């Protein structure tokens, strides 16, 4: 029991009592009172907003008009207060004694909702993690995932709106993160020994650590608030407290109503239910008799309606009958009667009603007898042993023994009896000391006749002593406690006189026995009898106070029980006893009339109102109860009130409270709320269709105002109403009223609009796929709403048509909000072309992000409809169609031959080509149509630019190796061609890193050739990176670029070969010849051209392959030609050397002169050896040119070919020269020179990698044999010999 605080009591002292009308009469034509509004204040909840008289709407209301409105406002507030109090009375009765519903235990637990402050705290925690301000260790991949989650999700305005609407929990945030990282982790490469599931678990654990922060989770409040336990099974006290908050009831008001309604008295609550059910049956009979029915959609439903009313009451009666007689009391041991559901209230006056037998009302009592002490014992010596015995119905118990000087025990004896009026005998004995004594001596006795109403405290009783006993004042102190069985509702002595029973006016002991929830009997008992002497069933009787009967002697306060054909008069000795008897019999009879004694009426209600007279209500409580005007709410007949209207208010207030608690409920009631609403509907006959129609209306209103409502909940209620209206009888109700039909059609239309609006705003109603499964459920519900009846399915095309229309709107909504966010309209009107292009590129990125989120978070629609992805693709096309307008505007503003828009194409095309439904769709084709001319123009200009750069470049080419300018080349812009009236196009997105490696792969190419190769490669890579989606045009582009490259390479090769020939022609023919770097550069250009042709010109199949072969052949032939030219140049030098040696041929004039001169001079001076300078010079020429070629020509294969041909050609020339002199003996100087040249040449070319087969050719063998023969001849003929020069052991000869 809650005691009111003094402040509350004082604050309520000033409430004035006012006359009140009946709240809402059932079937009344009067307008229903205004319902409490949602904006009701806590101190004055439920204040009407427009329900009463309208306020003045003048722009400047006067004080007088405000004065007139104030009484109206007070009147509205008072009317709402009365409605809430009346509702609370009905609610607390449902809570106090439920007999239909239970708190469900299988409901899904709702999660705690997040608020704005928590969202801001989360942002700060994740920002701190990204800034490295936490102790959480994470790798780069996890940090990137968190950064994406923070930027895309946590900072989203849609998430902020979802939090503000109260439909978001911590679990939603966690699930979104989990969904994001699953996609990331699946795309990571496999790591040995580390599964992706382990990575996911680790990332989730780190997320939880960031989410929690450093707060101490162990700090919990000692007492959980009511809102925190609302998801649990609540006690009655918690339910009372909850609905006090819901209906705005003060503690004092609750206390007064609690006492007045006797909520802790199960008998009173059961009796109240019986009265209510009786009233509902009488109302049904009255309705059937007067033919006043609600309007139904069919006339034959009127009789069915009456049967439904009776059937529902019978069901409630059966539920009540199934309860134990006294909930929570001792086990009920009376015989369970088998009675029909149409019990007493349905069969009043029925001659065949089941009669109780006397054995049906046998009671069982527990007696506790506690013997304390005996006083006045003088007849026995102090040291004698005394004891007491207790006897009930022949069963005896004995106390412990005590000395006569202190006869005290405190012993309790427990007995069980079926006698309402048992006889208890207590005797005092002393032990006999005589030898022949057979039994102890009795000192005194007392006989008691206890009842359940007897005093239970210890009292002194005078004992009857034997004759001649000295103990004239012997007393015993004992307590007799006789319990009151749960099914014995009242007992006591009454005078009675009846026509069928108790036909003589006399005083009897009566017991009011409850046999079952609907069966009560008034029984009179004699002493030591377990069965009543007479009994009367109270079914059909009406009890009331009466005036005294003059002819009856005995009894002071009269009352009677009247039934058709029978009257029983009762009388008690005092008023209090009469009130208790009448109250107990009033509960038992189930009568609707509330008997009130005339004296008490005048005392407690001098104004003449009907007061609930309750003996348990103290005078102070009664005064307060009367003063606060609670009487009308307690005494109001529930059968005469419009419970449909009241329940609508109750459900509305409950839903408002639920949506404002700490849980993300999405419109679902808590178990305690469901229990109370279920019990209310069952007990007060609220039709299921009405309940769900009101629920739908409330849920839709909240949803329209921004709250997050679970569409599954809407689906349940709508399906129930649809089944009811279409005759499927979900709750056994077959009647359908016109009002229900009309309201259902209105709600159906409203619900359809709401669902279509939600689908049109799916990104904002279901942000990031939250609540989980909501979009799928919304689509399923829309299909259900579009059905004409509950059994006929709607064609899929009709649903598809509606959803398609919604998604068309969604495209406009999403794009409009996106452009507003990007402020694209301002940019398009004022910005420069470059700025417009930059903004449209940013907008394209946002559009792609939106569509990717749609696919990621809203693809669940395919679970409802297989065609959802197709419609989502159509939605995307509409979305892109809107983007097309802004894109075309930005592109049209670009200057002619501007290539800055290509990144836009690449961005959009890369997204579209990877989407199977959007690839080559309407927008994709439009994008291609816009960029085809641009690409063609770009390629044309690049072709012209490259051709001119080749022409100009080779004209001015210095053939300086490119490695000398490689460091500055990446920063040099492409050259401008004066003949073109425009700047040459620059390759988009070309960075140094993408082409610098090619410069260092070939370090000796020319600037023109390297520039050509880079441009061709960059152009082809650029076109390849476009990933043109249309195959035919893509193939055309590739073919054109390959053929262009072939043409350019052909021109390059021809110009290089021509330049090579000219350069070589100008070179020296003597041993002073050293291959210029420019010649090596030209050689390298051809080598590079060979390499580049494979990449730049290769196409598979057909003409292109043949064209590529042609380029390869041209390059190969050119390389062969320049090798031949080089070899010819080298051989010509050797021929010059041999020409000089020819002067020493035998028989020539010069040879004779030279030989004579040398011999003569040799006698006097050291003459240099002729021919050695010439040999050394030639050998140096060979070696240095070999080194130059080896160092500066890149391709080893061509160097080997060159050296092979050079060596073979050299040996051939020497062999021919020697062959021409077969008939001549070589001059000694000729021999020395040739031996040295041949030996050194052989050795040097072997060191350069010329193979043995080439080195030891037949030509070489011929030369070797000839020189060996000549050497032998010379050694014989010449006295001085060859001075160590010999063909033998040439490998061991030192360097000369």
UniProtKB/Swiss-Prot annotation:
Locations listed in the record: Cytoplasmic vesicle membrane; Synapse; Cell projection, Cilium; Cytoplasm, Cytoskeleton, Cilium basal body
Residues carrying Phosphoserine: 56, 58, 1290
Molecular-function GO terms, alphabetical: lipid binding; metal ion binding
Gene of this entry: CADPS2
Domain notes: The PH domain is essential for regulated exocytosis and binds phospholipids.
Organism expressing this protein natively: Homo sapiens (Human)
Topology relative to the membrane: Peripheral membrane protein
Listed name of the protein: Calcium-dependent secretion activator 2
Chief site of localization: membrane
